């Protein structure tokens, strides 16, 4: 499986809806830039 997609899924599991859309740093969910980009591209 694609590591990026796996990381994205981990982030979505950890951060929930904060990881979806553009508001990656809302609700106390601050993600590293590489993971944010990964999640955004997922």
UniProtKB/Swiss-Prot annotation:
UniProt-listed GO biological process terms: defense response to fungus; defense response to Gram-negative bacterium; defense response to Gram-positive bacterium; killing of cells of another organism
Distribution of this protein across tissues and organs: Expressed in flowers but not in leaves, seeds or roots (at protein level).
Keyword check for Disulfide bond: yes
Free-text description of this protein's post-translational modifications in UniProt: Disulfide bonds.
Keywords: Antibiotic, Antimicrobial, Disulfide bond, Fungicide
Biological function: Antimicrobial peptide. Active against fungal species F.oxysporum (IC(50)=5.7 uM) and A.niger (IC(50)=5.6 uM) but not against B.cinerea, F.graminearum, B.sorokinina and P.debaryanum at concentrations below 10 uM. Active against bacterial species P.syringae, B.subtilis and X.campestris.
The protein's name in its UniProt record: Antimicrobial peptide 3
Lineage summary: Eukaryota, Viridiplantae, Streptophyta, Embryophyta, Tracheophyta
